[in-house]
UniProtKB/Swiss-Prot annotation:
Taxonomic source organism: Neisseria gonorrhoeae (strain ATCC 700825 / FA 1090)
Pathways involved: Amino-acid biosynthesis; L-histidine biosynthesis; L-histidine from 5-phospho-alpha-D-ribose 1-diphosphate: step 5/9
Protein name as it appears in the record: Imidazole glycerol phosphate synthase subunit HisH
Function: IGPS catalyzes the conversion of PRFAR and glutamine to IGP, AICAR and glutamate. The HisH subunit catalyzes the hydrolysis of glutamine to glutamate and ammonia as part of the synthesis of IGP and AICAR. The resulting ammonia molecule is channeled to the active site of HisF.
Compartment(s) where it occurs, according to its Swiss-Prot or TrEMBL record: Cytoplasm
Residues the record marks as active site: 85, 194, 196
Lineage per the UniProt record: Bacteria, Pseudomonadati, Pseudomonadota, Betaproteobacteria, Neisseriales
Length: 212
């Protein structure tokens, strides 16, 4: 089995690679895990992981420039697919960041947190939302196996998912209001938080993906 981590020059790629390889050892899988910016090699992989970090317009431009956008669209149709952070945001129709069109796998938009964001006590909250936060699993999913409800994951983001179809929401967090932080449809699973930075919980989720 081969698992491709898409390398389009945008993302914490070597951290992702290290985490996925550790997850592969935990899963006991005889799988080749590799970085690739080659559309043909991505198309031959059995599973695909799509990380991303930085501004969505830059990420979309880099993806298209490398000819990887079509490889991603093809993988979304029929391979187990895991989007992480901006890689997950790119799967939506549109983002308010730079008024950027995405790949359109999930209907809906990526919206920015309010600039004057306050908690229930009226204290101002920083944007980006950065640090550990609990995640509520709103539906059952194979990638949640062994992960308790309200487990903490690591976030760094100023924009959040706003899916058209609430049935695609698999997990939520609060900042301070609830927002979707995990979405899924068919063979595709995507998280706003950084799975590769989320210690044991992140490794368990990646292990579950390799077993999916």
């Amino acid at each position: 089995m081969q698992t491709a981590i898409i390398d389009y020059g945008m993302g914490n790629l070597h951290s992702v690679l290290k985490s996925v390889r550790t997850a592969g050892q935990l899963a006991g899988k005889n799988t080749k895990i590799f970085l690739s910016g080659d559309p043909d090699r991505v198309s031959r992989a059995d599973k695909v992981i799509f990380p991303g970090q930085g501004a969505m317009p830059d990420c979309m431009a880099a993806l298209t420039r490398g000819g990887l956008d079509e490889a991603v669209k093809d993988a979304l149709k029929n391979k187990p697919f895991f989007g992480i952070c901006v890689g997950a945001q790119l799967l939506f129709d549109h983002s308010e960041e730079g008024n950027t069109d995405g790949l359109g796998w999930f209907g809906g938009k990526v919206r920015r947190f309010a600039r004057d964001l306050r908690d229930p006590q009226g204290c101002r909250l920083k944007v980006p939302h950065m640090g550990w936060n609990t995640v509520r699993q709103t539906q059952n999913h194979p990638l949640f196996q062994g992960i308790p409800q309200n487990t903490r994951f690591y976030f760094v983001h100023s924009y959040y998912f706003a899916p058209e179809n609430p049935e695609t929401i698999l997990g939520e967090s609060d900042y301070p209001s609830p927002f979707a932080c995990i979405v899924g449809k068919d063979n595709v699973f995507a998280t706003q938080f950084h799975t590769e930075k989320s210690h044991d919980a992140g490794l368990t989720m990646l292990k579950n993906f390799l077993n999916w």
